[in-house]
Amino acid sequence: GGYYAIRLAAKRPKDVAAIAAYAGHMQDPNAGEPDQLFSVAPEVLKITAPTLYLIGDQDFELRRINIGRAFYALYERGVPVELQTYPLARRAFDFRADATPEEKIAARHARERVKGWLARWVCPKQGR
């Protein structure tokens, strides 16, 4: 998910034009508990790709504190970053078999956000 996207973007920046992460963890899932709670992954500090986070506000598996810290770390370095939170949406709201009406709307909205984000940053002549 999100962590592997940032990991790839940090290791191969010329190969990653933009990131759109649903439910993205911004810390190595194998990192120690203190790191998972109190810091962002070191890779976040190397990212130059525009980054879009899309998360459901009912996704309780995410460490939101890391997403917030990653957002601010990217912003402070001048990396284009946006955070979209979807009210009433649970983890994997974009493809749940048991999606609520709100999650179905959130999934449609998220698809449009991702399409626009990628058009803007991957294909700038067509996306602007």
Q: Which residues make up each language-model segment?
A:
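Glycine-rich nucleophile elbow surrounding the catalytic serine of serine-hydrolase chemistry
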Residues: 1-7
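Short secondary-structure capping/turn micro-motifs that flank functional sites
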Residues: 2, 25, 90-92
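Conserved hydrolase catalytic core segment
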Residues: 7-17
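The feature captures the conserved acid-bearing segment of alpha/beta-hydrolase catalytic domains
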Residues: 18, 24-85
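C-terminal catalytic histidine-bearing segment of alpha/beta-hydrolase fold enzymes
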Residues: 68, 75-128
